[in-house]
Amino acid sequence: MSEIIESTVAFLIGLLKASWTRTAWHFAVLSFVYVIARSIYRVWFHPLSSYPGPKLAALTQLWYARHWMGGRYPFAIEEAHRRYGEVVRIAPNELSFNTAQSFNEIYGHTTKDHKPFIKGTFYEHYQPEPGIVAERNPEKHRETRKLLAHGFSARALKAQESIIAQYSDLFLAQVKKLAKSHFWIDTIHDAGILVTLFEIGRRLPLLWPLILFSLPNGIKKKFDLFLKYSRDLVRTRVARQNTLTREDFFARLLADKSHSQSEEWLLAQANVLVIAGSDTTATALTTLIYYLAAHQDKLWHLQQELRETFDEASDMTSEKLQGMLYLNAVIEEGLRICPPTAFGLPRISPGAMVDGRLIPKGTVVSTSSWTTAHREDYFHDARGFHPERWLPAGHALWNAKFQHDHLSASKPFSLGPRGCLGVNLAYMEMRITLAKLAWKFDWELVNADQLDWESELRFEGFWKLPVPRVRFYCIHV
């Protein structure tokens, strides 16, 4: 061993004494040898070497980065699974799955026989404090989730319903006008590219200078504006802590004195609530408006259910709408066909079984929600918009051709201890808004011939949706 150390020291001293040209040459040779040796290891000797996938993905992060930058990452993963099977190696130390079983095993609740798959480095970011979504520590996440959960309880959501109804009515009042989005919605969509750039920079550190140089000034300004907006919300809410009579999402966070909450920590939670509470619902509703406009028979069935049940839009409470079977089927189908989070959420294997395979400890794994929800062996005519697949067998519109669909393969809000905390709020928002819209308006797609929805979809951390031109006709004033 001492001989090896002495030889290494002598080699380094020799490099220092050599000319810069010779030193550069030596480093070039060493770098080349290192790359070749690493490539040989990754292709033939790495623990994941037996898993199929694109050759470039086994060697480097470039395959991953190329498809993220192109905005078609969910579709690239789907194509990889179509070509290579249910388990695909998508990076040197990363596997993608597309089965319903893997969903439960990677993201499901921890048991005595099921070790937790913690979140990967994808969630690391450059803000002082992580929000609940980015928190990788299971204990800290559990504490924060417990505090926030009170704001999403059935009792709390019942208290929030009047606010949701108020804003859905405001939306309906603006439908016939050419109204622009609020700036924070635009900001979230535009700044979604930051998620892509940060992820590529993390995987390919040598590209950081190029990424920072190419970052558009407009996006940075919008993101700073969004942070200022969230910070103002936090400061206003903290100042009103002792005067509010209704419990909101921050009530328990501020009331808990077991540990101090800095403004940065509160800001991180506010960012999550604003983004998750706006982009997800907006994406789902836009998708539903498009697909219903493109499938007038589905829109008609939805309107018949609502218009035959309710005399006034104000009668549409969340509790009553939960019983509208076709409405709920439409929403589930919209979430399946365009899931809000379309890529596999990365987790780190603790050295556990997934889909009957022992995945080495430290391997990054995920299940692609887009790919799983579009498998033809899980969903009959998976590319088609068919709310009927979600109806019970006794419903008049139930169709036997969907009876073997694997409905649990659609997980738009993930599942388990890290599943979406606001899922019930999201469903309430979608039910109330879509129900009132379909009760009050007819609508049709104006640019059907110029629009290819799926081919125009782009994913940059958030969906960038095509722009459907829809003409609305007011039926109930």
Curated annotation (Swiss-Prot):
The keyword Iron applies. The keyword DNA-binding does not apply. GO terms for cellular component: membrane. Induction: Expression is positively regulated by the oxaleimides biosynthesis cluster-specific transcription factor poxB. CDD domains: CYP60B-like. The chain crosses the membrane at residues 24-41. It is found in: Membrane. Its EC number is 1.-.-.-. GO terms for biological process: mycotoxin biosynthetic process. Pathway: Secondary metabolite biosynthesis. Keywords: Heme, Iron, Membrane, Metal-binding, Monooxygenase, Oxidoreductase, Transmembrane, Transmembrane helix. One of its GO terms (molecular function) is heme binding. Its cofactor is heme. Coiled coil: none annotated. SUPFAM superfamilies: Cytochrome P450 (SSF48264). It is a single-pass membrane protein. Heme binds at residue 420. It is an enzyme of class 1 (oxidoreductase). Its main location: membrane. Disulfide bonds: none annotated. Belongs to the cytochrome P450 family. Cytochrome P450 monooxygenase; part of the gene cluster that mediates the biosynthesis of oxaleimides, cytotoxic compounds containing an unusual disubstituted succinimide moiety. The first step of the pathway is provided by the HR-PKS poxF that serves in a new mode of collaborative biosynthesis with the PKS-NRPS poxE, by providing the olefin containing amino acid substrate via the synthesis of an ACP-bound dec-4-enoate. PANTHER family: CYTOCHROME P450, CYTOCHROME P450 MONOOXYGENASE ASQL-RELATED. This is Cytochrome P450 monooxygenase poxC. It comes from Penicillium oxalicum (strain 114-2 / CGMCC 5302). The gene is poxC.
